[in-house]
């Protein structure tokens, strides 16, 4: 195995271990890390949505961005660039978030859920892989959001600066923010521990180019399995940890913060996989890229934040399975509004894919960021 593969394996193992530790310290079950859920919680904390159960300034998001920033500066890999179809990326980011919240998790949480025995997430993985496969068909035919261009360092540092400001405010003036008193938002690891763990994870993810989409995409497109090792390492560590601690629960019904409406688990992750291929990386990768100076990825993250606000203000997000008073399982899922949003998102992915195809002869596949 090449050296770079070991870097990816180590990074994946650390991510899996970090997720287990954060869950032990107070984060929700099977949610040691979740980019979609944590961005959604921050969105609620700053008042952009009113869902009282999912409001908290998650230091994990701040730490991931700052860890990537610190590592990229230390290794002289910080490159300020932007201008690659930012408006399109904003829209794609919003719909990737809507798809993730329909499923109740980003690709990273999908792996954590599978490691905890949640078979609904296996259905999500099928949809995720299908979405990646569809996106690859357009990459093969020359899909491109065009190149980014060098910009000033201030432009490249927008998201690290925003996250630093958010951290200062939540420490100095916590009364500015909304915090959940019950539900997933009320369950969290101590702020300092979560921040430090996330900084380490962010730094390693930057160094290893860790990406949940990239592993499957590269395996399909180039027969290159290096990034896939990270995906597998996360799963193996989380599975082992859950088996050791007795937290492993195999099945579909009543999994932590999950629903067993399988069609929408599948389609939600089709939307996430397809959109992430078009964007050049999963939600985790977008945070890391923004931390190392990519202004287009910062725009994508802002799009995801707006998508989270829309998802909860308009009732688009999934609802978990529950037990009623008669001890019967009530299957969750998404509302009619959410179903329309997911289907609309898939149509928008198709439109963006077709619109950004070369108008003449086929072009080479755009390299992943």
Residue ranges, per PLM feature:
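Membrane-interfacial helix-loop segments of redox and metal-homeostasis proteins
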Residues: 1-369
């Amino acid at each position: 195995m090449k050296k770079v593969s070991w870097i990816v394996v180590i990074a994946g193992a650390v991510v899996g271990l970090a997720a287990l530790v954060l869950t032990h310290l107070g984060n929700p079950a099977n949610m040691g890390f979740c980019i979609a859920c944590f961005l959604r919680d921050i969105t609620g904390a700053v008042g952009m949505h009113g869902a009282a159960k999912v409001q908290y300034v998650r230091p994990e998001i701040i730490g991931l961005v700052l860890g990537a920033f610190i590592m990229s500066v230390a290794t002289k890999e910080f490159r300020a660039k932007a201008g690659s179809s930012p408006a399109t990326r904003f829209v794609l980011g919003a719909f990737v978030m809507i798809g993730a919240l329909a499923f109740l998790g980003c690709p990273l949480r999908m792996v954590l859920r599978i490691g905890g025995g949640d078979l609904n997430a296996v259905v999500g993985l099928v949809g995720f892989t299908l979405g990646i496969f569809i996106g690859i068909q357009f990459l093969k035919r020359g899909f491109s959001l065009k190149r980014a261009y060098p910009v000033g360092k201030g432009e490249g540092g927008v998201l690290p600066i925003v996250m630093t400001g958010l951290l200062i405010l939540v420490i100095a003036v916590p009364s500015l923010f909304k915090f959940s008193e019950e539900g997933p938002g009320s369950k969290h690891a101590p702020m300092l521990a979560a921040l430090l763990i996330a900084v380490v994870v962010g730094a390693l993810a930057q160094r290893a180019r860790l990406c949940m989409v990239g592993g499957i995409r590269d395996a399909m497109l180039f027969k290159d399995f290096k990034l896939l090792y990270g995906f597998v390492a996360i799963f193996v560590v989380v599975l082992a940890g859950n088996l050791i601690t007795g937290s492993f629960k195999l099945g579909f019904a009543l999994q932590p913060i999950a629903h067993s409406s399988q069609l929408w688990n599948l389609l939600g992750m089709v939307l996430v996989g397809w959109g992430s291929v078009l964007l050049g990386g999963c939600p985790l990768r977008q945070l890391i890229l923004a931390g190392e100076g990519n202004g287009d990825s910062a725009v994508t993250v802002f799009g995801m934040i707006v998508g989270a606000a829309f998802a909860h203000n308009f009732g688009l997000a999934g609802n978990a399975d529950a037990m009623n008073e008669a001890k019967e399982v009530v299957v969750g899922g998404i509302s009619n509004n959410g179903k329309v949003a997911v289907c609309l998102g898939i149509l928008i992915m198709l439109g963006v894919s077709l619109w950004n195809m070369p108008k003449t002869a086929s072009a080479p596949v755009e390299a992943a960021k």
